[in-house]
């Protein structure tokens, strides 16, 4: 009797499930799947046809289990905040140190994350032995050797490289770095050609900050020069807008970033927001920034510059999506909602 009852109960449950499944329209099933697929920032942006939503990190921050768990759950891409910069990888001439960079790459690859290499040629965090070079041929060889060594080491593991970083002044002129002083703008060609040779499949970016207003001289100059260099055969694939934005109502807030991204993305094969953070993390400002990327079909992804406010380089501005207790802020919900509801 007990066996017959169990058989009957199983049959009733199976029938009930079948009826329920029949009554759920296909659209509802699809919506339920979409909501599950977009339950993280990375899943949501990929459902919009983009490549990644990411953040920056280094072995030190990855040692914080709360941050590493958030990255594993929410992010699809990692940028080394400092561990691939020149002072970290080649503090003395002829001596390379890849300990921290290797650890970052190992974390990313073992957890299925894309990597944006950052950065190859930059005037800051530059060892004194480089900044004191006075011979153009010597500097050319040094640039080529660094790029061949660093990019070559991670060939096939890095999605994109910030090849040249922050080379423009606010008025649009070229920054008077050691690279420009000795080589003029030819250092751009030298760097990008070396990177292409070292890893032909990596996407190569020029990256800068304060590119958040389409009428700003810095943005106009970068766009004009990228178009010129690309027409001359310099292998620039993408433009990275760091997107360190101010609070609403301040100069270079998110109010004009839509037009800025339109101008930047039109000048290259692809573009990205590479270091996004917004002072005070207004949900509305984060929504505007997110939409600015999504509105450009070749904007491949968004990288926020850190996970939690306590680890931000702008920590006093509380600019990130998680607070110092690793709790999601309203800005997080705004970004996720924007990604999930976006329609091209």
UniProtKB/Swiss-Prot annotation:
Q: Which InterPro entries match?
A: GH10, GH10_dom, Glycoside_hydrolase_SF
Cross-referenced Gene3D superfamilies, in alphabetical order? Glycosidases
Q: Which UniProt keywords apply?
A: Carbohydrate metabolism, Disulfide bond, Glycoprotein, Glycosidase, Hydrolase, Polysaccharide degradation, Secreted, Signal, Xylan degradation
Recorded superkingdom: Eukaryota
Its subcellular locations are: Secreted
List the molecular function annotations (GO) for this entry.
Answer: endo-1,4-beta-xylanase activity
Signal sequence coordinates = 1-21
Q: What pairs make up the disulfide bonds?
A: 293-299
Q: What is its EC number?
A: 3.2.1.8
Statement: the UniProt record of this protein carries the keyword RNA-binding: no
Q: Which residues does the Swiss-Prot or TrEMBL record annotate as the active site? A: 166, 275
UniProt family annotation: Belongs to the glycosyl hydrolase 10 (cellulase F) family.
Task performed by this protein = Endo-1,4-beta-xylanase involved in the hydrolysis of xylan, a major structural heterogeneous polysaccharide found in plant biomass representing the second most abundant polysaccharide in the biosphere, after cellulose.
Protein name per Swiss-Prot or TrEMBL: Endo-1,4-beta-xylanase UM03411
């Amino acid at each position: 009797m007990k066996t017959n009852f169990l058989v009957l109960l199983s049959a009733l449950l199976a029938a009930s499930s079948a009826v329920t499944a029949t009554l759920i329209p296909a659209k509802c099933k699809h919506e339920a799947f979409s909501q599950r697929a977009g339950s993280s920032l990375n899943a949501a942006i990929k459902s919009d046809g983009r490549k990644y939503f990411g953040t920056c990190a280094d072995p030190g921050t990855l040692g914080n289990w709360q941050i590493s768990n958030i990255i594993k759950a929410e992010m699809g891409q990692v940028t080394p905040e400092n561990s691939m910069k020149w002072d970290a990888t080649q503090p003395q001439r002829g001596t390379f140190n890849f300990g921290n960079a290797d650890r970052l790459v190992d974390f990313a690859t073992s957890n299925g994350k894309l990597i944006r290499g950052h950065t190859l040629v930059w005037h800051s965090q530059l060892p004194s032995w480089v900044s004191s070079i006075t011979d153009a041929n010597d500097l050319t060889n040094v640039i080529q050797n660094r790029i061949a060594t660093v990019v070559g080491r991670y060939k096939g593991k890095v999605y994109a490289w910030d090849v040249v970083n922050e080379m423009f002044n606010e008025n649009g002129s070229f920054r008077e770095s050691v690279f420009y002083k000795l080589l003029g703008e030819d250092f751009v060609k030298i760097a990008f050609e070396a990177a292409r040779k070292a890893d032909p499949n990596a996407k190569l970016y020029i990256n800068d900050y304060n590119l958040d207003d389409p009428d700003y001289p810095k943005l106009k100059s970068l766009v004009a020069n990228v178009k010129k260099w690309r027409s001359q055969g310099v292998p620039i694939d993408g433009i990275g807008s760091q997107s360190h934005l101010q609070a609403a109502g301040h100069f270079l807030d998110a109010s004009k970033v839509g037009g800025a991204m339109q101008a930047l993305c039109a000048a290259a094969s692809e573009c990205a927001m590479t270091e996004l953070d917004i002072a005070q993390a207004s949900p509305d400002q984060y929504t505007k920034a997110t939409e600015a990327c999504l509105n450009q079909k070749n904007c491949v992804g968004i990288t926020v510059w850190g996970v939690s406010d306590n680890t931000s380089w702008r920590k006093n501005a509380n600019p990130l999506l998680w607070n110092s207790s690793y709790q999601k802020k309203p800005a997080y919900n705004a970004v996720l909602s924007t990604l999930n509801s976006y329609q091209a």
